[in-house]
Amino acid sequence: MIKGSVKKIETLGLVDGPGIRTVVFLSGCKLRCKYCHNPEMWKLTELNYTPEELAKRIIRNKPYFKRNNGGVTFSGGEPLLQSEFLIEVCKLLKKENIHIALDTSGVGNGNYEEILSYIDLVLLDIKHVNPEKYQELTSHNIDESQKFINVLNKSKIPVWIRQVIIPGLMDNNEYLYGLKKQLQKIKNIKKINFLPYHTLGKEKYKELGIEYPYKNLDAMDKEKCQKLYENFINILNKD
C-alpha cells in the first residue's frame, strides 16, 4: 500500500494559485537552500496518509473551491519527491474535477510526465539562474530542475514563476538580465512573482539545532523588491 508523508495541511490559502485553496505540504526535499524557511520539511517523516485518506480530506473543501475557482496546491518540501503517492492522490482528485496546482523547484525523482498529466498549474520556484550560484545556494546542481523544465515545456500547462529576491544576490541588473534569458526558455508563463527574502524561519533553525546560513542578512525591503520587479518587467519588454 502506498502511503505519503504529509507535514501539514492549510485551508483557505489565497496566494498559492487561483481562488481559495487547500495547500498540502509534503515532506522531503533534496535541496538545502540557504534561505529555506521550512527546514523541518527537509526529511521524509512518518508515512501518515494513504492517497484515499488525503483525497477525502481535500474533497471535503470542494464547495469552497467551486465558489471561488479554487482547488488544491501541493507544496513542501518538494512534492515531486513523493511521485507515486502524488500521482495516486491526483488521480482521485481529477475524478472530482478539482483544480490541481504544483508548487515545485523541479527537483524530484522523475515520473515528471505522468505527474504533469494531472496538473493544471505549475508554480515554479527559480532558485538561481547561474549553475555555480545555484549549487552554492542549494547544495545541489541545476541539472535536475532543467530536466523538469524540459518536460514541462512539452505540456501546455500554465506556469507561474516565483523568484525569491535575496539582498546582494538577485537585486541587480546582471541577475535580472540572466533571469530574462532563463525565462525565455520556459513556455506558457502566465505570471511572475518576486518574493522578498524574509527571516521568519530563523527560529525554526534554532529549534532544530541547525545554524542558519543567513543569520546576519537582513530581510529584503518590500518596496525595493517591488521596484526591482517593475525594472524587470521593463527589461522583459526590451528587444
Where do the protein language model's features map onto the residues?
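Auxiliary Fe-S-binding modules of radical SAM enzymes
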Residues: 1-18, 167-239
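Canonical Radical SAM [4Fe-4S] cluster-binding loop centered on the CxxxCxxC motif
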Residues: 2, 8-10, 14-49
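Electropositive phosphate-/nucleotide-binding environments in soluble metabolic enzymes
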Residues: 23, 27-30, 48, 52, ...
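Short glycine-enriched, charge-decorated loop/helix-capping segments at active-site entrances
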Residues: 39-44, 135-141, 209-217
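Conserved alpha-helical substructure of the radical SAM core
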Residues: 39-68, 72
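Conserved AdoMet/S-adenosylmethionine-binding subsite of the radical SAM
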Residues: 59-63, 68-71, 76, 80-200, ...
